[in-house]
Amino acid sequence: ILRDLMTEGRKEFIDQAEKENRKQVYYLCMEFLMGRSLRNNLYNLGLEDAVSSALSSMGLKLENIYNQEPDAGLGNGGLGRLAACFLDGLATQKYPAMGYSLRYEYGIFRQKLVDGWQTELPDFWLPGGAVWLQAHPEKAVTVNFNGHLEERWDGSFHSIEVKDATKILA
């Protein structure tokens, strides 16, 4: 429900920005350390008290639900935190903006000491964090990996073709 409310609000906001011919920001970054989203989104929509009250009437605590959400660790430091703050600032100032990145299967790694040695483990953030993602399979494109390029000139027309590549849909 919360994601649906946010999606509808974003659609209305972008429609208005386009109607006013406002410029839009598209921010591409490899890392976004957004933190946990549920608390932030409830607060920004002004719904935290209402949801807390509704849950309380069912014998549940909102704080316990907050603690179930994994931290979307999609980066490991300054760059990811800066990107998140930048987007948060743009949203707060009501600029039409969208952040783009790769959807990592694993976030930043977790560390654990085993027999006195540091061991890195994958951060499985998707099982509880994918609720905020919105798939758009109709926008998928073919991405080529490996292979080689063949360059051709046909008069004044130049073309490059990728040969023997591994193709994936992304």
Put a short name on every predicted segment:
Residues I1-A170:
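A conserved ligand/cofactor-binding region detector
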